[in-house]
């Protein structure tokens, strides 16, 4: 069994994205940055990451492209997929909520989760259902004639690897 996983990456901009995804695929392993003076034992694993070309992409698109690339690579290395795909550090229902507000239909939102974020169909449906419930609650609040305080406490029945 591996003792440690070291991430060797050619662009530190994506280090945080990389460490979170690697930890998601290897939840019981310690993950650290590979440095020039790192001593690697035969039980350790080094994941060498070359960041793909990001020409013409904005910051958000670059991070999505990198996470998609690394997710595919880690999935291939481990033979595993993650229920929420590469989504980490974000409430999936927020993505669905914004898309519903923008008038997108449920099928389009589900395809977005599955194709872009690599989430399972089951989790995509869950995000949509939670977003619809949030929307129903928030639509009942009278913003004009009083004060409202909304505390975003997740009521999602699943526990994400990063939650």
How would you label these PLM feature ranges?
Residues 1-5, 37-44, 87-102, 115:
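SAM-dependent transferase fold signal centered on methyltransferase-like domains
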Residues 1-83:
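A short, structured N-terminal alpha-helical element that caps or precedes a catalytic domain
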Residues 27, 42-45, 58, 83, ...:
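Extended interaction regions within the primary functional domain
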Residues 74-81, 101-149:
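N-terminal [4Fe-4S]-dependent radical SAM core
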Residues 90-97, 133-163:
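N-terminal pre-triad scaffold of radical SAM enzymes
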